[in-house]
């Protein structure tokens, strides 16, 4: 069974790649260079894909800085730092990129139909503190209907299925799953800041560090700055 994997190089997407392999899929990964602040993640995506031994890794290029609207695509919007986990859960954060997962899933759908894949794996996580609207179960259900209605395969009764194995998992549970699957955490990248070393203070770094700490595990990545989460 062929599967397209949305791979950012982060903790979640790397876990779903290894899950797809464990599910017996022939894996094709797709990453996106949308001129994001943290383009460093693309290097990690390549390394994770290479280590996993997938069939093909694609990088799609487009520029979401053309209209911005997010701290990840507009340098005039400050990146949140040193926020508590409770503070992260209050509102949809400025790191939300408008319609990003819809854009990503559209590319993944086209890729999947072109190679006659049966699945698209995405690492969305509704229980995380991000609050992103395009990481929630109702969104995935709606996009599944788009997959069914908007493709030849779907209209012929063989829709491409969206697989979101992390949707109801906590970050700690994702790490535990990744450990079981053999995910190389040292190759992954979560930081939003855009440096060569993970900052340790952006929301993404703090979520990751807090999860490793809760499990009593050491995150193998070096960090520029560490403070209790």
UniProtKB/Swiss-Prot annotation:
Q: Where does ATP bind?
A: 7-17
Its EC number is 6.3.4.20
Which cofactor(s) does the record list?
Answer: Zn(2+)
Q: How is the cofactor bound?
A: Binds 1 zinc ion per subunit.
Describe the reaction catalysed, as an equation. Answer: 7-carboxy-7-deazaguanine + NH4(+) + ATP = 7-cyano-7-deazaguanine + ADP + phosphate + H2O + H(+)
Task: Show the Gene3D superfamilies listed in the entry.
Answer: HUPs
Instruction: Report the GO molecular function annotations.
Output: ATP binding; ligase activity, forming carbon-nitrogen bonds; zinc ion binding
Question: Top EC class per UniProt?
Answer: ligase
Q: Where does Zn(2+) bind?
A: 191, 199, 202, 205
Domain of life of the organism in this record?
Answer: Bacteria
Name a single GO biological process. queuosine biosynthetic process
Q: Which pathway?
A: Purine metabolism; 7-cyano-7-deazaguanine biosynthesis
Question: Is this entry keyworded Acetylation?
Answer: no
InterPro entries reported in the protein's UniProt record = QueC, Rossmann-like_a/b/a_fold
Any idea which UniProt keywords this protein has?
Answer: ATP-binding, Ligase, Metal-binding, Nucleotide-binding, Queuosine biosynthesis, Zinc
Q: What does this protein do?
A: Catalyzes the ATP-dependent conversion of 7-carboxy-7-deazaguanine (CDG) to 7-cyano-7-deazaguanine (preQ(0)).
Q: Which NCBIfam families match?
A: 7-cyano-7-deazaguanine synthase QueC
Q: According to its UniProt record, which protein family does this protein belong to?
A: Belongs to the QueC family.
Report what the protein is called: 7-cyano-7-deazaguanine synthase
Q: Whose protein is this, by species?
A: Nostoc sp. (strain PCC 7120 / SAG 25.82 / UTEX 2576)
